[in-house]
């Protein structure tokens, strides 16, 4: 394995009966990256995270985490991994401190190190004033922060987050984004799944579009957008049926936009990650994570 990569996956396949939840997936994630799987509910995001983080088995392929085969060397691989699942597994009847300490015990941390590590992480994340709060009394955003401390208590190199901001309001979501940026800037490799295009575009160095257990496209948000054209003309007439055209240059986009009369509303803008996702997959994702009705075929140059 190339030591530059903390995740190296080849031919990963997971079957549920005749259904391929993961379908021959190949991927690599570099150390220190913030990497996103972007796709709708049912695309295979959660199943992939569970397989990569040793929470479920798989039928074909290989997974290397931090240089260790997760089948042949599961304990070594697990030591490098922290996981936060979409549905947080905290004990709501315990305090913040009790939850964090129970995770330290689960990770078999030496007694002398537990309090020091929890205090360090809590100060870093801003949880020090909440030790005596019952978890059930915290907001969704603060519960996520407790879960992050629990996931990092054994000092892993890689953090998996499955749909980390689902159910959070916009303020809590952006607060969590800031925290993830801070962790990443300090060297943590982060692999997250999301159906929020803005989240992937704002946070991540590289993004994969995933659909039916396969990676459709992969690259930086900018590179993915540029694959369909650097500039987008968005236009609609009296029927309010929005269409799109993509161009490599602003001049081409401007020239195209001049053909429309005053009955049309026309916008020329830079192409974004959402444009690329819709163009490459033929679908849009709703706020609830489910596919919306396929848009009408776009027109373009």
Name what the model sees in each region.
Residues 134-138:
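Conserved ABC ATPase signature
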Residues 175-254, 260-261:
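ABC transporter nucleotide-binding domain
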Residues 155:
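Conserved catalytic motifs of ABC-family nucleotide-binding domains
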């Amino acid at each position: 394995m190339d030591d530059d990569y903390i995740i190296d996956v080849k031919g990963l396949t997971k079957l549920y009966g005749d259904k391929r939840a993961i379908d021959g997936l190949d991927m690599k994630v570099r150390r220190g990256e913030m990497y996103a799987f972007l796709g709708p509910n049912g695309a295979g995001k959660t199943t992939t995270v569970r397989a990569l983080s040793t929470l479920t088995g798989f039928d074909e392929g290989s997974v290397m985490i931090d240089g260790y085969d997760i089948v042949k060397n599961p304990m070594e691989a697990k030591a490098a991994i922290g996981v936060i699942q979409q549905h947080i597994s905290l004990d709501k009847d315990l305090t913040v401190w009790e939850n964090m300490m129970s995770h330290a015990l689960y990770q078999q941390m030496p007694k002398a190190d537990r309090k020091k590590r929890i205090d360090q992480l809590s100060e870093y994340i801003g949880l020090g004033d909440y030790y005596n709060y019952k978890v059930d009394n915290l907001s969704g955003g603060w519960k996520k922060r407790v879960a992050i401390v629990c996931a990092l208590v054994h000092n892993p190199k890689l953090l998996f987050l499955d749909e980390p901001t689902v159910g959070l309001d916009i303020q809590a979501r952006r607060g969590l984004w800031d925290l993830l940026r801070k962790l990443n800037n300090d060297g943590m490799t982060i692999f997250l799944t999301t159906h929020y295009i803005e989240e992937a575009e704002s946070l991540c160095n590289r993004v994969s579009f995933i659909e039916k257990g396969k990676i459709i496209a992969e690259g930086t948000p900018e590179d993915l957008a540029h694959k369909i054209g650097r500039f987008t003309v968005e236009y609609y007439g009296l029927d309010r049926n929005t269409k799109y055209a993509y161009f490599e240059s602003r001049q081409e986009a401007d020239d195209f936009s001049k053909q429309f009369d005053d009955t049309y509303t026309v916008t020329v803008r830079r192409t974004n990650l959402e444009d690329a996702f819709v163009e490459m997959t033929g679908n849009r994702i709703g706020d609830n994570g489910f596919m919306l009705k396929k848009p009408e075929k776009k027109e373009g140059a």
